[in-house]
């Protein structure tokens, strides 16, 4: 299978020359877009939207119809994996995701098994295939999963948390139980991402949203080593084309060199680290993705453009190795016109800097 017509994103991840800096946004298909809100309304609820391949395809494509983005990302949710493992995902109105059966008991943890992505997550694979057909080889499609530790946070807490006291208590009191959860989840994520690749994903990303809440030693033991295992288990090629991998730990700047050493092709950065400093620290080992503060998009368009240029200038002179993104997901309250200003600024300024 040939590369997409616009393969700038893939080339940047593989540190091949590009004519400009490619750009996509975490949560680019989301509630800041009125068309997304309309589709979600038709779906009835968020889970219905995720589990309908046709609707997931529709919302995946919406930001690409509006903006000149360089990649599409599968519309789904990181919690589909623990849901497939039998924890009973549901969304309480106004309260976010919850699990009916959080993992607190030893017997339940010992009964966990690796999920078969085709048996339990077939709707995701159907969505990937449908999106690839709809994209018609225009831009690459990114598949994704949460990291084992981030998924375990929800699996043990049963919902989002401000202090993660249940999983932290397990980490210190019964690290063996947490390692059991992480091991089964890591193997499930490997199978899940490889199934996405087989279904058409052309790059994959691991979102480690909560790894940055760990202590230095705990991060390496309970988050990083499992992401290393996943990266090692990923399919590196499909139909003769390299499948790059991106790893993103929010608040992970402390461990940048260690993340770059696990075998991934690119490291995602949040907005708390200077991307130029990050580049100096990792050298040419990996590409970098990021890292504009998402809240910049609440500023005036000319400020958005100026802040985007600061990120590009900080990365420094190069014709490859940088994928522009936000430092975290785009806010649902973002004015859509701010994204227009951002895309135009990134593409135009990066083209000029290569002349």
Curated annotation (Swiss-Prot):
Substrate binds at residues 27-31, 77, 154, 209, 328. It catalyses: uroporphyrinogen III + 4 H(+) = coproporphyrinogen III + 4 CO2. One of its GO terms (molecular function) is uroporphyrinogen decarboxylase activity. The record marks 77 as: Transition state stabilizer. It is found in: Cytoplasm. GO terms for cellular component: cytosol. The keyword Manganese does not apply. Keywords: Cytoplasm, Decarboxylase, Lyase, Porphyrin biosynthesis. InterPro entries: UROD/MetE-like_sf, Uroporphyrinogen_deCO2ase_HemE, Uroporphyrinogen_deCOase. Its main location: cytoplasm. HAMAP family: URO_D (MF_00218). Belongs to the uroporphyrinogen decarboxylase family. Catalyzes the decarboxylation of four acetate groups of uroporphyrinogen-III to yield coproporphyrinogen-III. This is Uroporphyrinogen decarboxylase. It comes from Dechloromonas aromatica (strain RCB).
